[in-house]
Amino acid sequence: MANKQDLIAKVAEATELTKKDSAAAVDAVFSTIEAFLAEGEKVQLIGFGNFEVRERAARKGRNPQTGAEIEIAASKVPAFKAGKALKDAVK
């Protein structure tokens, strides 16, 4: 499994940037996507995929320790849907 450091190394290799500059670029991309999602904006990267915020409805659940029914509040969660080019590349 690749991690953030692996991603930074690949970006540095592909762009001939230093690892420090690549780390700054990767961090900037992640924080920018996060900022758009925090504002409720969808981020569409043609060919790669879409990042968006989805609403999870309130629902009933069970406490696994007691078995008592509990109410789980509605929430917002980040979601990613892969684009066609990414799906095709993985096949």
From Swiss-Prot:
Xref: Pfam families: Bac_DNA_binding
Gene3D superfamilies: IHF-like DNA-binding proteins
Gene Ontology biological process terms, A to Z: chromosome condensation
GO cellular component terms attached to this protein's record: cytosol
Protein name listed in UniProt: DNA-binding protein HU
Keywords linked to the UniProt accession: DNA condensation, DNA-binding, Virulence
Gene that this polypeptide is encoded by: hup
InterPro entries: Hist_DNA-bd (IPR000119), Histone-like_DNA-bd_CS (IPR020816), IHF-like_DNA-bd_dom_sf (IPR010992)
UniProt similarity note: Belongs to the bacterial histone-like protein family.
Function: Histone-like DNA-binding protein which is capable of wrapping DNA to stabilize it, and thus to prevent its denaturation under extreme environmental conditions. Also seems to act as a fortuitous virulence factor in delayed sequelae by binding to heparan sulfate-proteoglycans in the extracellular matrix of target organs and acting as a nidus for in situ immune complex formation.
GO molecular function, one term: structural constituent of chromatin
